[in-house]
Amino acid sequence: MTKTFQALALGFSLLTLTTVALAQTTETPPAADGATPTDLSMGADPNPGLPSQTEAEVDQTYLAANFDNWEQRCVKTADGSDPCQLYQLLLDKDGNSVAEISLFDLPAGGQAAAGATFMAPLETLLTANLTITVDTAKTRIYPFAFCTKLGCVARLGFTGEELAAFKKGIKAVLTIVPAAAPDKSVDLDLTLAGFTKGFEAVSAANAK
């Protein structure tokens, strides 16, 4: 650390301590009887969640419905043709938020009956790819496509048969590998309870 940086750091520390001391020793004038002080913070919800459709503004994502652990999320548009996806937050064994997945329907006739976007942490080992296993079915492997400041993304396609397995299944296990521990893997449980109704709702909304 250079002397200049040390001096700046010390000055900042002293300034902070002085500010705290002043705040502790300066008395706030009492409010008049029956009046509410105007400098009080009433607090706010740290996790306000998504707005409803009526509360959302154009181009804002809103929560349309819940299906067990699945959320139907849509983007409000000016013409009312709000595109929707089926979203689930994935947790590790300790209950920490690790990744997220959003599924959506695709036009009939293509190789993929449904698509999905999976986002993993930036600390993920990309060359290890993403694997998905639905119940006891054969494991499938998917590469990561790109990374943003928020995380690394894999773009997935599911055949009609694979989509049917999701609808009939109990859970899927999505596995990623940490870059800091390439000899270990992280298994994320994706509950499929509510998936069928949720995917039907998304498909119906996107068909409008």
PLM regions: where:
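Sec-dependent N-terminal signal peptides
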Residues: 1-25
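A generic "folded-domain core" signal
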Residues: 4, 24-208
